[in-house]
């Protein structure tokens, strides 16, 4: 009898295993990643992403125009106006999904160049030092009206390709060099977002364990912070593209969202910024309906709501502004041993300083993470994940800065940046891709013992390694030994 019972249990377990293998567990979460993409194909050098809900998407890679700590107020406004112009260019039925990625990595200078011993020693000193690197992607998505029957519309497809060309032309006219990701690059971006690994050349995927607070993946965990709670829109009534910080008792303008690139203990941060362009007439009609509903029930809160709606209607009528739906979230990945409360407290504190209170209701962690995949932004719930605002305000909440990186120039002089890693700078200002002057003369001034000779020896050595002729004029004989070592000619000044 015991043998029959054991055989029965074994048969039952085998049957359950076969059932799960064949039909799945019935859980939507188990299949959620299979329901995102249909395929990624290359069209005229552009990697076009097709979702299973029949949306088309393509992704641009570029660098934000404002360098960090540039204190360029005009640059912040120009970039915000550019994003607003892109939304107006795309028009109804399109979405912009901008992703700014920040990842911690170890410094490694492996360009394969042959260097002298001093230069090799210089780079060996910095090898392995951690710093933050940044990447910017902009995904353009065409919405597909949800229906049970999916069909190909050549008119919509041609309109999509036309909009892609217009977006790139608009960026080029603004002085931003952008490149469409091809099929391989788009696939790599999707895979790296899934693993939240943007630093390693070779990476692997792990199983996910999800709860209401975070997503566990391998040796790290990730948490999605939704910036705006639509039930209590705790954002400033008036915003601008920058904010002021105090530096040595002096006010300095920085990007309003500059706080997202310096979250403590974070290995990877992805700042998702989504803008959806709806039908303007329908949204204005809904606003009018809301205004009438509020005005029909007199109360202080309803009167304030009526005044706000009237103000928005006036701005739209006078300045031809655009209404958009937006969603912003931060995906923060940390190592397993990091206390989740530490980055959470930091994010809540820094955003509260600019009048934004992080949503406390982001319990749908997996859905927020999946809906932030490139090209999948229309999966965001239009009931509780998006909020309505003006296009200008939405652009102000976008990240506009880029981290310090080496200049594109054949004449590289290395200095360390604020993170303590070497970056190449063309101190002449005339050899790089961005030419600032046609005069390569420069002057080094400082009191005795301030390090002029140490600095100039390093600069001249690097110029010499770049096969550059150097003429130096010095009040003393500090560089006589250097001149002799490099085989140059020293001409001392005499009264005769």
Residue ranges of predicted features:
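Glycine-rich phosphate-binding loop of nucleotide-binding enzymes
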Residues: 49, 72-76, 80-88, 100, ...
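Short, solvent-exposed loop/turn segments at the edges of secondary structure
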Residues: 131-133, 323-325, 408, 418, ...
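Pre-P-loop entry segment of helicase/translocase ATPase cores
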Residues: 393-398, 403-420
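Extended, folded cores of ATP/NTP-driven motor/assembly subunits in large transport
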Residues: 3-401
């Amino acid at each position: 009898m015991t043998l029959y019972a054991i055989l029965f249990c074994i048969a039952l377990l085998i049957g359950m295993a076969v059932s799960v293998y064949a039909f799945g567990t019935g859980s939507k979460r188990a299949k959620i990643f299979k329901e995102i993409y249909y395929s990624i194909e290359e069209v005229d050098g552009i990697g076009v992403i097709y979702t299973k809900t029949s949306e088309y998407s393509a992704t641009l890679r570029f660098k934000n125009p404002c360098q960090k700590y540039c204190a360029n107020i005009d640059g912040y406004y120009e970039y915000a106006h550019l994003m607003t112009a892109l939304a107006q260019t795309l028009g109804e039925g399109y979405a912009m999904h901008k992703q700014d990625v920040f990842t911690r990595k170890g410094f490694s200078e492996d360009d394969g160049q042959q260097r002298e011993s001093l230069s090799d020693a210089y780079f060996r000193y910095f090898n392995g030092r951690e710093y933050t690197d940044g990447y910017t992607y902009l995904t353009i998505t065409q919405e597909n009206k949800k229906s049970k029957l999916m069909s190909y519309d050549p008119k919509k497809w041609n309109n999509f390709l036309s909009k892609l060309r217009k977006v790139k032309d608009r960026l080029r006219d603004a002085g931003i060099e952008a490149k469409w990701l091809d099929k391989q690059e788009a696939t790599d971006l999707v895979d790296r977002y899934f693993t939240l690994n943007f630093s390693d050349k070779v990476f692997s995927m792990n199983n996910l364990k999800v709860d209401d607070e975070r997503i566990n993946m391998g040796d790290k965990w990730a948490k999605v912070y939704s910036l705006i709670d639509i039930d209590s829109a705790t954002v400033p009534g008036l915003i601008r593209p920058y904010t002021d910080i105090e530096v040595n008792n002096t006010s300095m303008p920085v990007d309003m969202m500059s706080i997202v690139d310096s979250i403590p203990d974070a290995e990877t941060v992805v700042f998702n910024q989504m803008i959806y362009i709806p039908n303007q007439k329908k949204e204005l009609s809904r606003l009018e309906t809301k205004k009438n509903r509020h005005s029909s029930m007199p109360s202080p809160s309803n009167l304030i709501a009526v005044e706000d709606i009237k103000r928005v209607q006036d701005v739209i009528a006078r300045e031809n502004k655009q209404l958009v739906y937006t969603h912003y979230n931060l995906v923060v990945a940390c190592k397993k041993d990091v206390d989740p409360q530490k980055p959470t407290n930091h994010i809540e504190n820094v955003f509260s300083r600019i009048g934004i209170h992080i949503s406390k209701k982001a319990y749908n962690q997996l859905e927020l993470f999946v809906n932030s995949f490139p090209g999948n932004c229309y999966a965001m719930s239009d009931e509780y994940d998006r909020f309505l605002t003006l296009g200008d305000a939405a652009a102000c909440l976008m990240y506009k800065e880029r981290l310090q990186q080496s200049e594109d120039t054949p004449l590289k002089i290395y200095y360390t940046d604020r993170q303590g890693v070497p970056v190449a700078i063309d101190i002449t200002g005339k050899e790089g891709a961005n030419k600032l002057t046609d005069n390569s003369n420069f002057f080094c001034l400082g009191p005795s013992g301030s390090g002029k000779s140490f600095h100039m020896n390093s600069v001249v050595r690097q110029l010499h390694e770049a096969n550059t002729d150097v003429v130096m004029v010095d009040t003393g004989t500090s560089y006589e030994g250097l001149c002799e070592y490099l085989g140059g000619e020293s001409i001392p000044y005499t009264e005769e």
